[in-house]
Design a protein with these regions (language model features):
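Bacterial N-terminal signal peptides that target proteins for export
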Residues: 1-9
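Sequence/structural segment immediately N-terminal to covalent heme-attachment motifs in c-type
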Residues: 22-40
Length: 106
């Protein structure tokens, strides 16, 4: 009986953790951001989650992230340099993605 309960609890934990990681990059980011960034792992630039964690206590996170995407730079990360507007993101894509990134760690 204990092994059945343990199996149920373990399975429930795996299902719940799977939901937490099941965030896909929005279409606005796949073509222009996905070359250098992923949701949960560093590629050439930091993961979207790492950026979100960096700004999670900042009420102006989305606007700061948008400014960083717009002007480009390294932003204190130890790797990579982001070109201005990434691979050509327009203003509406930048605003959408900035809010998406800022909200990941909330």
């Amino acid at each position: 009986m204990d092994s059945i309960v343990g199996s149920i609890i373990a399975t429930a934990g795996l299902i719940i953790s799977g939901f937490a990681l099941a965030v896909d990059m929005p279409a606005e980011g796949k073509a222009k951001c996905g070359t250098c960034h992923a949701i949960d792992k560093n590629i050439f630039g930091p993961s979207f989650m790492a950026v979100s964690e960096k700004y999670k206590d900042d009420k102006d996170a989305a606007s700061k992230i948008a400014a960083n995407i717009t002007v480009g730079g390294s932003f204190g990360w130890l790797f990579g340099y982001m070109p201005a507007r990434g691979l050509g993101a327009n203003d509406s894509e930048i605003q959408f993605l900035s809010k998406f990134i800022a909200d990941l760690a909330k």
